[in-house]
């Protein structure tokens, strides 16, 4: 039995909940539930017995979740939620109430943080509390309350939550101050097996690590970081970060790679150099990758390479300065060119992230983004439409101007639960964006020089396996036959 049951609910096969854009990705990526397991570790550190079930990664069915609930009979059930899956997620709150009428149910995640009242209304009594923002310490307080006598009057004293009072009216307690990231324990990785998670771009098996929270950026398309983590950069002590790497390697000695999922890993020179120097000093032999801004201090790259950094996941975003400025990215095309060239010179693998759908964007500017991506020395790319999630600045703008397509949360994914284009602009329609995504991938990957470069990058059997997997996903997406320039 467990006092607290934390569920990453299943949706459909290969649905990735922990990604920035929750959906089934074309590459069928599955990401580690690092945030959830950090909260689990906080609960366990406080002495609670916790059961954790990653129904999404394990592709579990409703009956398996039901059996786990009945076996553990928790007093508190915690549900992770996403925008497209919110209605499905809430059915597991109803299931918990049906099986365990006395249990309390709590929802966490960016979607419910952005839409607490809508969530409570949809729940129709199957949800007791919505936690807004960082939930690590909030869940600990709710678990204490569940064990000592739950009441709405006591809920009023817990910061950062929303619930319905005795009159049926929504109550939103004051926001919780952002926590000290150095107080957080390492994620409770003993609840999962890293081999459940996959990404063709990473060496298998890999694990994710978050070295800080918050971001000073003002990107209008970003939802999760400003909503959940705030606008202030809070980086963990570099020695603590490398302690976590050592912990992961001791627990899972077969790991091939560590992925720093921190959105702003390269934003602080002091943090990056501290982490790299500690890795070198401790003689850790592990490849690692990270998210990277284009305005990173280029003098850091040699040290990053020496400490084992293999791949940079770079948010280039657009190929015109007008589009970058329209989404308040705070970077320039010159930053992009300099970083890509220096990374290639030093031997990094570079994955470029590009988007379509900036305010004021046209077909011509979108084609400029494709051309710009092809001009940069990169190994892999992704193209997507801007995913205007509730809680983001661009969502508010799109809603006000009538550019937003979905009229229900399920509309953020298509009929196959893959990411859907949700914007249709005056000079760039949804259909054009969909076509441009496929055209960009086709034009980038089917160039002879790109095919040759990718073949040259195959040095191990693991490299070959990842390339074959990626190629299969590429072909399954129907990209080879796509051409948006064909007459309709």
Model regions and ranges:
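Radical SAM [4Fe-4S] cluster-binding motif and immediate context
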Residues: 182, 186-351, 358, 371
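N-terminal [4Fe-4S]-dependent radical SAM core
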Residues: 10-19, 23, 158, 163-208
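Glycine-rich beta-alpha loop elements in corrinoid/cobalamin-binding modules
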Residues: 35, 39-177, 385-391
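Residue-level signal for the nucleotide or nucleotide-sugar donor/cofactor binding architecture
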Residues: 60, 134, 236, 267-270, ...
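Short, electropositive alpha-helical surface patch
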Residues: 60-65, 69, 273-279, 362-378
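Radical SAM enzyme core and accessory elements
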Residues: 2-6, 69, 75, 166, ...
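Short catalytic helix/loop segments, enriched in acidic residues and glycine
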Residues: 21-40
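Conserved C-terminal portion of the radical SAM core fold
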Residues: 76-79, 104-106, 242, 249-261, ...
């Amino acid at each position: 039995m467990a006092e607290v049951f934390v569920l990453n609910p299943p949706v459909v096969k290969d649905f990735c909940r922990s990604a920035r854009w929750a959906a089934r990705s074309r590459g069928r990526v599955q990401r580690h539930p690092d945030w959830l397991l950090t909260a689990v570790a906080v609960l366990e550190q406080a002495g609670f017995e916790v059961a954790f079930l990653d129904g999404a990664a394990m592709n579990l069915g409703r009956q398996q979740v039901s059996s786990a609930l009945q076996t553990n009979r928790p007093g508190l059930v915690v549900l992770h939620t996403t925008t497209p899956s919110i209605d499905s997620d809430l059915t597991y709150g109803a299931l918990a109430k049906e099986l365990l009428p006395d249990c309390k149910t709590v929802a966490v995640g960016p979607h419910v943080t952005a839409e607490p009242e809508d969530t409570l209304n949809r729940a129709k009594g199957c949800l007791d509390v919505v936690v807004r923002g960082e939930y690590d310490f909030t869940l600990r307080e709710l678990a204490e309350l569940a064990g000592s006598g739950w009441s709405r009057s006591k809920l009023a004293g817990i910061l950062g939550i929303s619930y319905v009072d005795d009159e049926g009216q929504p109550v939103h307690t004051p926001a919780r101050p952002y926590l000290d990231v150095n107080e957080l324990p390492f994620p409770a990785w003993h609840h999962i097996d890293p081999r459940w998670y996959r990404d063709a771009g990473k060496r298998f098996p890999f694990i994710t690590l978050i070295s800080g929270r918050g971001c000073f950026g003002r990107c209008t398309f970003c939802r999760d970081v400003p909503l959940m983590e705030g606008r202030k950069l809070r980086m963990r002590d570099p020695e603590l970060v490398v302690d976590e790497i050592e912990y992961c390697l001791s627990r899972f000695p077969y790991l091939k790679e560590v992925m720093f999922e921190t959105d702003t890993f390269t934003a602080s020179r002091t943090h990056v150099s501290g982490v790299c120097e500690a890795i070198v000093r401790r003689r850790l032999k592990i490849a690692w990758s990270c998210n990277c801004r284009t305005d990173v201090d280029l003098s850091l790259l040699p040290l990053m390479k020496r400490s084992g950094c293999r791949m940079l996941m770079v948010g280039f975003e657009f190929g015109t300065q007008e589009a970058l400025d329209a989404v308040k990215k705070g970077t320039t095309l010159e930053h992009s060119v300099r970083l890509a060239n220096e990374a290639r010179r030093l031997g990094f693998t570079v994955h470029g992230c590009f988007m379509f759908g900036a305010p004021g964007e046209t077909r011509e500017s979108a084609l400029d983004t494709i051309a710009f991506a092809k001009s940069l020395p990169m190994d892999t790319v992704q193209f997507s439409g801007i995913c205007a999630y509730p809680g983001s600045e661009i969502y508010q703008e799109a809603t006000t101007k009538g550019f937003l397509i979905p009229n229900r949360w399920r509309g953020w994914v298509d009929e196959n639960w893959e990411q859907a284009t949700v914007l249709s602009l005056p000079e760039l329609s949804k259909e054009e964006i969909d076509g441009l995504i496929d055209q960009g991938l086709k034009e980038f990957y089917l160039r002879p020089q790109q095919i040759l470069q990718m073949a040259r990058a195959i040095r191990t059997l693991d490299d070959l396996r990842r390339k074959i997997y990626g190629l299969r996903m590429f072909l399954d997406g129907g990209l080879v036959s796509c051409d948006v320039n064909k007459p309709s």
